[in-house]
Amino acid sequence: MNYKVASAKNIATLLFLFSSQSQAFDLGKIAKIKAGAESFSKVGFNNKPINTNKGLYPTETFMTIMAYMQVDFAELLPKSATANGHHLDGSLGGWGGAVIYDTTKDFINEVTGKPYGAMAWNYVGYWGGLVGQKPWASCGLATGNLTQSQYDKMTQAQMTQLSNQEALEASTCAKTYADHTRNYVIYNAYLRYNYKDIFEIRGGRYESPADYMSGYNQGLDMTLNLGNFKFWWFSSFGRGFAYNEWLYNFYSPKTYTLKNGQTINPGVHAFYIIWNYKGWSIQPFVYFSPFNEYDPNFTITYDSNPTFTGLGFRSQTDVTVLNPFYAKRFWDTYQFGMPAGKNAHSLMIKQKFEWNEYNFGFGIYKSFGNANWMIGYHGNRLGFDFWTNTVYANTLNSLSYMMDANAFTVFAFGGGVHRKLLWGLLGRLTYGPRANEQVLSLNLGYKFTKNFSADIKFEYYNMLMHQGYKMGWNGPKLDSQPATDQDRSHIFTEIVWKL
């Protein structure tokens, strides 16, 4: 398989050729332009100074401004082809923006008496090259990078000293990323062919439909429908973000270094076999990244009213089990503050009810072993945002501790849509070996016009880090580290304008 995905330039050339080779094509008829501007802000309530030795970090406040333009080509084939069920469409779109306010630039580290450094690049502008080949990407963002056998040779005092030292090095590394941001991305650049409702193939850059690879995909996917069966293949050789909170140019989330030192992009791939019958859906599927992980999984869902359109009653049940197996080189390492191990499992059970314009439900999410550090955190079927921690958590990202090894989460939600107003409530309790979390959030959204809408979320978020564990350290337990209780409460706002 050719791992090199067509560039945006090649896609644009193809679109031009298709649209210009026949007089039957009228650009005004086949092309539709979309454009808009959006803004996102997060307001954190914990503004205490940083102390890297104690593992104490504030909750960031930042604001973005974004704009995009997209050209959609609805049909690129002549009527003689479409009459026989053949269709070809495509899209080309670009997104750009910037952080216009960022409190992380001013947070002081009490250990050094100096600013820790800007961290908003973690949301907007992160860039180290497709496979992390850029010079600044070789520094250590993560702490606790030794193996268990190496830690076994160290005393507790030595590990504590190492955790303090690496936290300062991570700060220096973060500053180099802040100096090399890339605040734009060609997020859409694809062609899609389908034949009736039987076969479809799409390649290029497009928003990922994969449950466990969110964002935008650089790769391809294929669908084959045969009666009650659906077969779906997905390949990703790059992941990007083009949203008002997140803006990343494409990077490979899974890489492998050859013996000669060259880093390659083996991609992330998935294959689903889906059987649908009278509301039931049984989905055995596998995700894998060569040299990294192999995950045989399954999902079973039941929908009592698949044609639900907002009137009447609907019940939806979702049971998903993930079973990641890791490459041998990871077995002795620490990931998300816990040993990776050979393999792990996770279980999600989610129940949702809808009655006219209202919805409510509940669920559980349980990890057995370190199940999420490869597959679970790049995307999930949970249906809510679990990236609302501080940007300093887990060594420089805002991932919730509900993704930790052996963590157990119970959650409940409810909401409704009333003409132009929508609202939602979410409560979550997480119990884990590293941290407990209590979350309660209220979301409100209003569509003022067909072109303008706004949303706001209020979230109470308390995080209790257990004794022996320190934020910013992903290595073994530190006996001298006391428990810490840190406030992660915040407000999200979103403003969206579409042309």
Sequence positions of predicted segments:
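Bacterial N-terminal signal peptides that target proteins for export
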Residues: 2-11
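Beta-barrel outer-membrane channel/assembly domains of diderm bacteria
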Residues: 15-201, 223-224, 419, 425, ...
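Transmembrane beta-strands of outer-membrane beta-barrel pores
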Residues: 37-45, 94-100, 205-209, 226-228, ...
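Residues that define the transmembrane beta-barrel architecture of outer-membrane proteins
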Residues: 61-67, 182-187, 214-218, 225, ...
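Residues on the lipid-exposed face of transmembrane beta-strands in outer-membrane beta-barrel proteins
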Residues: 67-75, 189-193, 220-224, 270-277, ...
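Surface-exposed coil loops of outer-membrane beta-barrel proteins
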Residues: 112-274, 283-290, 384-403
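Outer-membrane beta-barrel translocator/channel fold
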Residues: 232-297, 303-386, 390, 456-493
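C-terminal structural cap/anchor segments
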Residues: 364-447
